[in-house]
Swiss-Prot record:
It is an enzyme of class 2 (transferase). It comes from Shewanella baltica (strain OS185). Belongs to the glycosyltransferase 4 family. MraY subfamily. The gene is mraY. Its EC number is 2.7.8.13. The lineage of its organism: Bacteria, Pseudomonadati, Pseudomonadota, Gammaproteobacteria, Alteromonadales. It catalyses: UDP-N-acetyl-alpha-D-muramoyl-L-alanyl-gamma-D-glutamyl-meso-2,6-diaminopimeloyl-D-alanyl-D-alanine + di-trans,octa-cis-undecaprenyl phosphate = di-trans,octa-cis-undecaprenyl diphospho-N-acetyl-alpha-D-muramoyl-L-alanyl-D-glutamyl-meso-2,6-diaminopimeloyl-D-alanyl-D-alanine + UMP. It is a multi-pass membrane protein. GO terms for cellular component: plasma membrane. Its cofactor is Mg(2+). Signal peptide: none annotated. CDD domains: GT_MraY. It holds the Pfam family Glycos_transf_4. This is Phospho-N-acetylmuramoyl-pentapeptide-transferase. Catalyzes the initial step of the lipid cycle reactions in the biosynthesis of the cell wall peptidoglycan: transfers peptidoglycan precursor phospho-MurNAc-pentapeptide from UDP-MurNAc-pentapeptide onto the lipid carrier undecaprenyl phosphate, yielding undecaprenyl-pyrophosphoryl-MurNAc-pentapeptide, known as lipid I.
């Protein structure tokens, strides 16, 4: 929004040209989201407490989690508000990338909100029926996938980038829709499964978003894109604003979500943030890289799939409890140790993912 105002004011003073630089607006976007989260966080927590919107804790979970019962949840509303305000202020509203991301965050945030509302307000421990949640996620993801395929302006927007191989970038055609669908829905649910400990999901989300900010910036510049053998995607620089807004909002939320948490993000936060990461990966053609950098999310998801599959096929469980972070809790690891070690793994995987841009 302010880009247009700055463009007009440039007629009177050339100093306003600085707002045309993506990097400058990205920094302002990060700071805006961060300050907004830190400023309104306490107010939201107080409001959630007054409304008695508290976390529902499973009776069959680790005993250490029983103390979390009643902790304010749906804090993802704070994250979404910070991102929306930041992007609307500093993003180029003429960019389709911006509106795609706002739609993703809004639609998946709404699905998560309905799920949280049923759990904590209507006291329905199951929340939104899994079948309906999946149907709604699928509808939103397919809308995005079809839109991106139909509006692709150059061949690079539907190619698949394969890490470690600089000359392997197959044209996907209509398969793009299928890959985009599974990436968005898969990432959304993966982050949701990871969000089981204080700060466990938000920090890897911040790290992956920061990495994608760099990738989006490089993809938007022909010289960098050609040098790194990645698709040149004109206009993708606007995704940098979205990514840094996620980073700022996430760090601000972590201030209150770090152990012991004062607030949880709920499904309204985890489903929307996961879908956002998946969509960014699709937009910059780095779906495989998301699997690497978001390895913690993949690990959590696979642990659930293996646990359920093993129990149904063999009648035996592989882990003491799934997702896998609960397994380590039941082994006796203190919650902060599990969290920080998963963060360390995430740092390593994000750096590995960034290294693949050059290791080709």
């Amino acid at each position: 929004m302010l880009v247009y105002l700055a463009e007009y004011l440039t007629r009177f003073h050339t100093g306003f040209n600085v707002f045309s630089y993506v990097t400058f607006r990205a920094i302002l976007g990060l700071l805006t989201a961060l300050v907004f989260s830190l400023w309104f966080g306490p107010k939201l927590i107080e409001r959630l407490q007054l409304l008695q919107i508290g976390q529902v804790v499973r009776n069959d979970g680790p005993e250490s989690h029983f103390s979390k019962r009643g902790t304010p949840t749906m804090g993802g509303l704070l994250i979404l508000a910070a991102i929306f305000i930041s992007v609307l202020l500093w993003g180029d509203l003429g960019s389709r990338y911006v509106w795609v991301m706002l739609f993703v965050l809004g639609s998946f945030g709404l699905i998560g909100f309905i799920d949280d509302y049923r759990k904590v307000v209507r006291k329905d421990t199951k929340g939104l029926i899994a079948r309906w949640k999946y149907i709604l996620q699928s509808l939103a993801a397919l809308l995005i996938a079809f839109f991106l395929y139909a509006t692709a302006a150059n061949p690079g927007e539907t190619q698949l980038v394969v890490p470690f191989f600089k000359d392997v970038m197959p044209q996907l055609g209509a398969v793009f829709i299928v890959l985009a669908y599974f990436t968005i829905v898969g990432a959304s649910n993966a982050v949701n499964l990871t969000d089981g400990l204080d700060g466990l999901a938000i920090m890897p989300t911040v790290m992956v978003a920061a990495a994608f900010a760099l990738i989006a910036y490089l993809s938007g510049h022909a010289q960098f894109a050609n040098y790194l053998h990645i698709p040149h995607l004109p206009g993708s620089g606007e995704l940098v604003i979205v990514c840094t807004a996620i980073v700022g909002a996430g760090l601000g939320f972590l201030w209150f979500n770090t152990y012991p948490a004062q607030v949880f993000m709920g499904d309204v936060g985890s489903l929307s943030l996961g879908a956002a990461l998946g969509t960014i990966a699709v937009l910059v053609r780095q779906e495989i890289l998301l699997v690497i950098m978001g390895g913690v999310f993949v690990m959590e998801t696979l642990s659930v799939i293996l646990q359920v599959g093993s129990y149904k096929l063999r009648g035996q469980r592989i882990f003491r409890m799934a997702p896998i972070h609960h397994h380590y809790e039941l082994k006796g690891w203190p919650e902060p140790r599990v969290i920080v070690r998963f963060w360390i793994i995430s740092i390593f995987l994000v750096l590995l993912g960034l290294a693949t841009l050059k290791l080709r």
